[in-house]
C-alpha cells in the first residue's frame, strides 16, 4: 500500500522486512545459540513461509479492483455513480490509478473538442457519456464505440489523451480481438 493504491511487490521488500525483524530479535536474544538461530536464513525463510500461509494476509483476485464504479485518482477515489470524491482507503483494494485528478477547466481540451467536433455541443456531451461509460467496464448498454473518419481529424489525439489520463485503467486491444 503506497497511500493511494496497492502495488505488486516484486522487490522482496517483505523478505527484507522479515530479515530485519529476525536480526533485531537476534541482537536482543540473551542466548547465543538462540541469537544465531534467529539470524539464520532458515529462520527468515520459515517466517516468510508462515506469513505467506497466514489467511489474514491473503486476498483472492476477485477482491482487487472489485467495484467497477470506483475510479482511483491521485487526489482520491471517485464514485462514478455520484461523481463524489473521497480519500483513498486501503480497504478498497485498488491497484489501478489514473494520472489526473478531476477538476480544473481544461481549456486546451475543450478547444480541441470544439475543433474536432465543429463546436457540436451534443457531440461533446455524447463523447463525455461514451468515455464515462467505458470507464465503468459495465456492459449494461451492450455498446461498442468506434471512432471513424478521415485521417488527421483528432481520433488518435482523443484516444491517446484519454489513455494517458486514465493511466492504469487504459488498455489496448489488438484488432484481431474483434
Regions found by a protein language model. Give the residues of each.
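Short, small/acidic-rich helices and loops at N termini and domain boundaries
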Residues: 1-48
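General helical structural elements
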Residues: 23, 53, 94-97
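Extended, Lys/Arg-enriched charged tracts that mediate electrostatic binding to polyanionic substrates
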Residues: 33-77, 81
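P-loop NTPase catalytic core of nucleic-acid-dependent motor ATPases
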Residues: 1-12, 63-65, 70, 77-178
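Residue-level signal for secondary-structure boundary elements
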Residues: 26-35, 46-47, 55-59, 121-125, ...
